[in-house]
Each structure stands twice: as structure tokens, then as C-alpha cells.
């Protein structure tokens, strides 16, 4: 008798995706982050669902409803801290996942890569709107500053901002629509994730060597299911350590003060995972220029396949490109640090230099290194 997982219409899809999927035998731990992101998404949806049961999207009660969740709801505090720190873990896994794809040349799978960029934008939008919901000082002012950036768009900017706000300032209408969108977007992310997987399984996974793995493939289960579970354990450990011992380590103390439109915090800054883009935004003195640089800092990922000049796909045997890649990673850490600092000397000049080097490494130096390495191979 044929196994039910190979004949049943529904189980057959699961079987081809997670059990009998032919996978390259040499993929490393860097390929674990896809499954970790899936687990983060499931956890965010579950914790978010329980938080939404007790949260009220109203300017007068939003802050106190979050306090009520932490104080009065059974295990409300752990649900809330798992959700906030879960977002941080989500972005850590997301950035490592993108970094791995850049290092090993996975962006050559165009459909998968483009869906991935759409996923990144959607996750960023969801996280931003989630940060507004507790209605603390940083929530309110973060929402005001970031949405106000759209006013830099010529002609329609001001109208667009007021349309998003639902009035002439960030108020009840803004909070209600942000809550609605924050609730619905994770389900859109889930649909996009399924599309991402669908396109990935059309081509098969990449591998560290960047060559065709067709000659040596193994079934996904049990080999990679075990490997993914092994990767899941440290992630759960870090997450629980954050939620139980250092729940506010990655947050902002200003968000424990209720939102006050009459009192501006000394330093308005977003969550740590947006600081690199925020630093690029601030490094340009012109408003429209800053907004364009902010969008391009992430949208630049879409043109990576066009900038690939090397004959080899992976950076594994390309020392010059490797050096540039790690310079880019260090540069991103510098930008993240600068994004959290006040706008004063020497931070402004460091931010401007880091922003210039960020774009030059990706747009000029990496393609040049690829061409140099092509010529070196002829020697």
C-alpha cells in the first residue's frame, strides 16, 4: 500500500515541501534561518493574537491597556515581552538570512529574491506599526516623524500624510488604522512566505559552493529537520533569556511614558533594527534626498542580481569580494550605532561617511571586484 503522505492531495504538498524535498547535502547552518523565521512568524502571530484580545486601540486607553496586560492578565507580561523581543529575533534572523543570500549569491534566483524583498518591506511596515500601538512617547513621536517623511513627496506629500493620519495629526484615527493593519499584515506575510517557498522549490536550494547540487541531494527529513530543530534551540534560549531577564534591553525607556503631543523627547529614534536606515536618512541634510536614500538603502537589494559581474556565484572562493562583504557588514553596524546617537559632531560626519561607503561598496566596489576576480582566474 502506498504511503498516505504520497497520495493524499493535502499531505502530498506537505511531503514535497518538508519531507521528501531533495536538498543539497552540503548546506551549512546559514541555511537554518529560513525555518527560524517561520518559527518567529508563528510565535508572533500566536502571541499577537492573545495580546489583541486585551488591547484597546484608543488614544485614551491604549497605554493603560498594555499596562493591564502586563499586570492583570494571566502571564500577560511574558506574552507581551515574547512579542516585543520576538520582533527583535525576527529581524536578527531576517538580516542574517539576507546576508547569507548576499554572500552565497542566492539573489540569482530572481523570483525568490524579489518575493523576499517584498517580505522584508512588509515585515518592516508591520514592525513599525506595532511599535506605535503601546502609545508611549516614542510610539507617538516615532509615528509622527516617520509618517511625516512622506510629506517630502512633491505635490501629493502633505495630502498623503493627512490621509494616512486620518486628520491633521497622529491621533485616534491613526492608532485605530495602525492596529487594523498590524493585525492583518502578518497573514499577508504568511501568504508571501508560501509564495517565497513555492518559487524556491521551483529551482531548489542554493549551496555554499554556488554550483549545481543535482548530483548530490538528500531528503529534507530527517537530515535537515533535525538540523533545523538544533538551530531552533539556541534561538528559543536567547528569546527566553531576553524575555525573562532583560525584557527592556532592546526597547526605549521613553516608551514607558504615556504619549504627550506637547512634550517632544530629546532624541527621537526608531527600534534598533531600523537604525541603520535611520542613520542614512539623517546623514542627508535635504528632506527629499534623505527619504530617497532611506528607501534606496533597502531597495538596493533589488538590483543586486544586475550588479553581479563575477563568473562564480558564491563568495566562497573570491577573497577580494569577501573583504568587501565584511566591510559592508561592519559598515552596517557603524550605521546602526550612529542611528542611535544624537545629531551632533562627530556622529554626523561618521554617519555621512558610513552612508557613502554603504552605497559605494554595493554599487561600485563589489561589481569591480567581480571583474578583477574574473581576470585573476585566467592567470
Swiss-Prot record:
Name of the protein described by the UniProt record: Cytochrome b
SUBUNIT field: The cytochrome bc1 complex contains 11 subunits: 3 respiratory subunits (MT-CYB, CYC1 and UQCRFS1), 2 core proteins (UQCRC1 and UQCRC2) and 6 low-molecular weight proteins (UQCRH/QCR6, UQCRB/QCR7, UQCRQ/QCR8, UQCR10/QCR9, UQCR11/QCR10 and a cleavage product of UQCRFS1). This cytochrome bc1 complex then forms a dimer.
Superkingdom to which the source organism belongs: Eukaryota
Primary gene name: MT-CYB
Keywords in alphabetical order: Electron transport, Heme, Iron, Membrane, Metal-binding, Mitochondrion, Mitochondrion inner membrane, Respiratory chain, Transmembrane, Transmembrane helix, Transport, Ubiquinone
Species name: Choloepus didactylus (Southern two-toed sloth)
Cellular compartments annotated: Mitochondrion inner membrane
Transmembrane segments: 33-53, 77-98, 113-133, 178-198, 226-246, 288-308, 320-340, 347-367
Residues engaged in binding heme b b562: 83, 182
Amino acid at each position: 500500500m502506498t504511503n498516505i503522505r504520497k497520495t493524499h492531495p493535502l499531505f502530498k504538498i506537505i511531503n514535497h515541501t518538508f519531507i521528501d524535498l531533495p536538498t543539497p547535502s552540503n548546506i551549512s547552518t546559514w541555511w537554518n534561518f529560513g525555518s527560524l523565521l517561520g518559527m518567529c512568524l508563528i510565535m508572533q502571530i500566536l502571541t499577537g493574537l492573545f495580546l489583541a484580545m486585551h488591547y484597546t486601540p484608543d488614544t485614551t486607553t491604549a497605554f493603560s491597556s498594555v499596562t493591564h496586560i502586563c499586570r492583570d492578565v494571566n502571564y500577560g507580561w511574558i506574552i507581551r515581552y515574547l512579542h516585543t523581543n520576538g520582533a527583535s529575533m525576527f529581524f536578527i534572523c531576517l538580516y542574517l538570512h539576507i546576508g547569507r543570500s548576499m554572500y552565497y549569491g542566492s539573489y540569482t534566483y530572481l523570483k525568490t529574491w524579489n518575493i523576499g524583498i517584498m517580505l522584508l518591506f512588509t515585515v518592516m511596515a508591520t514592525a513599525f506599526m506595532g511599535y506605535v500601538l503601546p502609545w508611549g512617547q516614542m510610539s507617538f513621536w516615532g509615528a509622527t516623524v516617520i509618517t511625516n517623511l512622506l510629506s517630502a513627496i512633491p505635490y501629493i506629500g502633505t495630502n498623503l500624510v493627512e490621509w494616512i493620519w486620518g486628520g491633521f495629526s497622529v491621533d485616534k484615527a491613526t492608532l485605530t488604522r495602525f492596529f487594523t493593519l498590524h493585525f492583518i499584515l502578518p497573514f499577508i506575510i504568511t501568504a508571501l512566505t508560501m509564495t517565497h517557498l513555492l518559487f524556491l522549490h521551483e529551482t531548489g536550494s542554493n549551496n555554499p559552493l554556488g554550483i549545481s547540487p543535482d548530483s548530490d541531494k538528500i531528503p529534507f527529513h530527517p537530515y535537515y529537520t533535525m538540523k533545523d530543530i538544533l538551530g531552533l534551540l539556541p534561538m528559543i534560549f536567547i528569546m527566553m533569556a531576553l524575555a525573562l531577564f532583560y525584557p527592556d534591553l532592546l526597547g526605549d525607556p521613553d516608551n514607558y511614558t504615556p504619549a504627550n503631543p506637547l512634550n517632544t523627547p530629546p532624541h527621537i529614534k526608531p527600534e534598533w533594527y531600523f537604525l541603520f536606515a535611520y542613520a542614512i536618512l539623517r546623514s542627508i541634510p535635504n528632506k527629499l534626498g534623505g527619504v530617497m536614500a532611506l528607501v534606496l538603502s533597502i531597495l538596493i537589494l533589488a538590483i543586486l542580481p544586475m550588479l553581479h559581474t563575477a563568473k562564480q556565484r558564491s563568495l566562497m572562493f573570491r577573497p577580494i569580494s569577501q573583504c568587501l562583504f565584511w566591510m559592508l557588514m561592519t559598515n552596517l553596524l557603524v550605521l546602526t550605532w550612529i542611528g542611535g546617537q544624537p545629531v551632533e559632531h562627530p556622529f554626523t560626519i561618521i554617519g555621512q561617511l558610513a552612508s557613502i561607503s554603504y552605497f559605494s561598496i554595493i554599487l561600485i566596489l563589489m561589481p569591480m571586484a567581480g571583474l578583477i576576480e574574473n581576470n585573476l582566474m585566467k592567470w
